[in-house]
Amino acid sequence: LYSDGRFLSSLHVNNNSINELGTIEMSGNEVFKIAVNRLSDLAEETLKDCNMTSDDITWMVPHQANIRIIKAVAKRINLPMSKVIQTLDTHGNTSAASIPLALDTGVRDGRIKKGDMLLFEGIGGGFSWGSVLTEY
């Protein structure tokens, strides 16, 4: 799990007041680069720490923010998209709920089975990012 406030201006809510609503401000190209670099590096770090490679992953269950980010991370860690649970086309970006929704979808449709090795990855504004590697 990581956090780095240097990226705050790339993706944030523009109002700190609790009395007024703010809006999300995002630098799309910058967010894409940060997300792909951080999530790819973290996937490799997590796998290395567990003495595994991308070949050991049955399914990657990523945060469902952007299909381009998901595809770029999968490509960088040599994981085919056929091993990625992707629900953007059904649910869109549901923020913090996207990983649990993707997991539920994969379980309910029978793709994710007992004993599968799952790599979860998420990233959020400000920025914070993390991963979990677990056997289902």
State what each model feature region is:
Residues 1-87:
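Hydrophobic pocket-lining "lid/loop/helix" segments that shape and contact the acyl-thioester
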Residues 36, 58-136:
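Claisen-condensing/thiolase-fold acyl-transfer catalytic domains that form or cleave C-C bonds
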